[in-house]
Regions:
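A detector for small-residue-rich transmembrane helices and their helix-helix packing motifs
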Residues: 1-202
């Protein structure tokens, strides 16, 4: 079975006003990591597990598996997939949570992630391929970070400096055109775009 991963590229940044990890980000990091390793060591059949708790568009509607737009956020297709998403969550989420407060941050995170899941299930209607990963929510965080700290520098791959606003625009454009041209990708670009759109509306 082919899985669609919603993963983010590696990014580094500096200049945050508070380097401590707030409770919301910490909770999400712990939950995602614990669930990943529980699934890995459980010995369960991955195809069966992902088809029930990943986001399978056709099952959300035909089988009324309405929990999938939530549970897919906590599943990842491998350690690197998990590492990238959790790194971006930690790097960009902590400043947003310090700025907004934990409750508002978590509401936004889940609004983007769940909204992206619902959008993916609509636009991917008829698909039996499970979508897994937190990147719908993570892309929403990147948008919010770009709007909140537009001129802050980040380092792509730890080397190339770029202002956050240009990075976010670039990622959005890439995801959009990739969704238009890619028909056999393991990355769910629709989920990335939807996370940003929900974040913008929110």
């Amino acid at each position: 079975m082919r899985y669609q991963y919603t993963s983010s590229g590696f990014k580094n940044s500096f200049g945050g006003s508070n380097n401590s990890v707030p409770i919301g980000v910490k909770l999400l990091l712990i939950l995602n990591t614990v669930i990943f390793f529980m699934v890995e060591i459980s010995g369960m059949q991955f195809e069966l597990f992902y088809s029930n708790f990943g986001l399978v568009p056709v099952k959300v509607w035909s089988s009324f598996m309405i929990w999938q737009p939530v549970t897919y956020l906590f599943l990842h297709g491998g350690f690197i997939h998990l590492l990238f998403n959790m790194f971006v969550l930690w790097m960009f989420g902590k400043d947003l949570e310090h700025n907004w407060g934990s409750i508002s941050f978590l509401k936004y995170y889940f609004a983007c992630g769940i909204g992206a899941g619902i959008a993916t299930s609509i636009f991917g209607w008829g698909s039996f391929t499970p979508v897994i990963g937190a990147s719908g929510a993570v892309y929403g965080l990147l948008l919010a970070y770009g709007l909140t700290y537009p001129n802050r520098l980040v380092y792509l791959y730890g080397i190339f400096p770029i202002k956050v606003k240009f990075m976010v625009i670039g990622m959005g454009v890439i995801a959009f055109f990739a969704s238009m041209t890619s028909t056999n990708s393991t990355v769910s670009h629709i989920t990335h775009i939807a996370g940003m759109v929900v974040g913008l509306i929110y």
